[in-house]
């Protein structure tokens, strides 16, 4: 056992004296290469009408004007990307065969905007006109929000698959569960 300790000690002493590949940093002498491209993004949050639309149930033309105004501002501030929240609480701010329309858009979950339009398609087209990338921002886990004003739509996951929901539903308007 003592022999092993001596060998390890000898190895450590020898290894400590070997020249290492030294790269001494001298402040101010080496600049890292600039990134090939900067990502300057702004978020447009739609849950609880944080950023857009300013309130639920606005006329479609007003919704469009507000969205275009946000995209104009992002371009003016030299952003090159927008992250647009399109799925807030297992609902959609785009035409979806699987999930209901968002209450933050129309005021009632599951209600189609009138006249019908696709906010995501509009956002993509208008962002590209301004030289902005548009990234669709999905929240994959949240199924409800405490500020919900309307009951879950009939095709909402809370109603179609309540067994997979792990939240307290007593305070959700019209959820039918406690």
What does each of the following model-derived ranges do?
Residues 72-78, 116-134:
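A structural motif corresponding to the C-terminal end of an alpha-helix
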Residues 18-84:
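Mature N-terminal, pre-catalytic/accessory segment of carbohydrate-active enzymes
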Residues 81-85, 133-139:
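Outer-envelope exported proteins of Gram-negative bacteria
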Residues 65-70, 96-102, 109, 117, ...:
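Glycan-recognition patch characteristic of GH18 chitinases/ENGases
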Residues 77-114:
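Aromatic-lined carbohydrate-binding/catalytic grooves of carbohydrate-active enzymes
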Residues 5-17:
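Bacterial N-terminal signal peptides
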Residues 45, 49-65, 125, 129, ...:
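Active-site-adjacent "subsite" loops/lids of carbohydrate-active enzymes
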């Amino acid at each position: 056992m003592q022999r092993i300790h001596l060998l390890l000690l000898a190895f450590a002493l020898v290894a400590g004296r070997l020249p290492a590949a030294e790269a001494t940093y001298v402040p101010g002498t080496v600049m890292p290469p600039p990134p090939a491209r900067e990502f300057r993004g702004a978020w447009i949050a739609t849950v609880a009408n944080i950023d857009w639309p300013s309130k639920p149930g606005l006329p479609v033309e007003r919704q469009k004007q507000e969205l275009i105004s946000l995209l104009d501002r992002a371009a003016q501030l030299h952003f090159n990307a927008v992250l647009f929240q399109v799925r807030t609480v297992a609902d959609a701010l785009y035409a979806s065969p699987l999930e209901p329309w968002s209450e933050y858009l129309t005021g009632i979950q599951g209600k189609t905007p009138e006249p019908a339009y696709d906010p995501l398609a509009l956002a993509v087209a208008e962002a590209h006109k301004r030289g902005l990338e548009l990234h669709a921002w999905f929240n994959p886990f949240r199924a409800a929000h405490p500020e919900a004003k309307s009951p879950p739509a009939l095709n909402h996951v809370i109603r179609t698959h309540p067994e997979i929901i792990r939240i307290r539903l007593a305070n959700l308007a019209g959820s039918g569960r406690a």
